[in-house]
């Protein structure tokens, strides 16, 4: 899957209610800046906080990107005024233990531990935790890290049943996330050098 495909890739897990309305307002702005919306959540934290998670198409994000998005979406939110109370706008990266909201997230983080919940029973459960071992167009397979008596060690979870999913912080995840960030920075530096030569 290329970065061009990633920007148009739909999210598997989307907001509801007011969060959904806010996402509909800001997502076109974020996509127009070559970023992807990960999640919107209005929380009762420090008064009222509107948390917006976004990332570049390659999955990276830095403070400058957060500032750019905040500057771009703030006036749009002021005009549309979806929240009828004062709130703090917080734009951030999804972080290392990120929410998994697109199929490409599962492909990218294959081999890492995910915790997820389904909207219906899958293999007589709704909550799962384990290492992602396979991903296809219809779902992903995890190897459970705690197998109950009578359960198979591996379970395939259809994307259509997914209600929530996030990576679990491990040493391997930190190592791979730092490696991916270093690679993204090197590619950005190479692109800047190529642009300067032209």
From Swiss-Prot:
CDD domains: YlxS_C (cd01734)
Main location as per UniProt: cytoplasm
Protein location: Cytoplasm
Keyword annotations: Cytoplasm, Ribosome biogenesis
Pfam families the record matches: DUF150_C, RimP_N
InterPro entries: Ribosome_maturation_RimP, RimP_C, RimP_C_sf, RimP_N, RimP_N_sf
Keyword hit for Cytoplasm: yes
GO cellular component terms, A-Z: cytosol
Domain of life of the native organism: Bacteria
Signal peptide (from-to): none
UniProt record, GO biological process: ribosomal small subunit assembly; translation
Function recorded in the entry: Required for maturation of 30S ribosomal subunits.
Family from the record: Belongs to the RimP family.
Entries under PANTHER family matching the protein: RIBOSOME MATURATION FACTOR RIMP
UniProt protein name: Ribosome maturation factor RimP
Organism: Rhizobium rhizogenes (strain K84 / ATCC BAA-868)
Name of the gene encoding the protein in the UniProt record: rimP
């Amino acid at each position: 899957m290329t970065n061009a495909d990633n920007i148009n890739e739909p999210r598997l897990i989307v907001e509801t209610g007011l969060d959904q309305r806010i996402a509909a307002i800001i997502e076109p702005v974020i996509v127009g800046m070559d970023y992807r919306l990960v999640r919107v959540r209005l929380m009762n934290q420090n008064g009222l906080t509107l948390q917006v998670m976004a990332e570049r198409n390659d999955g990276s994000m830095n403070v400058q990107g957060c500032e750019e998005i905040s500057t771009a979406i703030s006036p749009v939110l002021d005009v549309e005024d979806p929240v009828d109370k004062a709130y703090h706008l917080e734009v951030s990266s999804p972080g290392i233990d990120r929410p998994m909201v697109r199929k490409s997230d599962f492909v990218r983080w294959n081999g890492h531990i995910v915790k997820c919940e389904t909207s219906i029973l899958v293999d007589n459960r709704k909550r799962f935790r384990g290492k992602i071992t396979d991903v296809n167009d219809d779902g992903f397979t995890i190897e459970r890290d705690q197998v109950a008596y009578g359960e198979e060690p591996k379970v395939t979870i259809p994307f259509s049943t997914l209600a929530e999913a996030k990576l679990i912080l491990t040493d391997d995840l930190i190592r791979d996330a730092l490696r991916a960030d270093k690679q993204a920075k090197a590619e950005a530096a190479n692109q800047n050098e190529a642009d300067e030569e032209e």
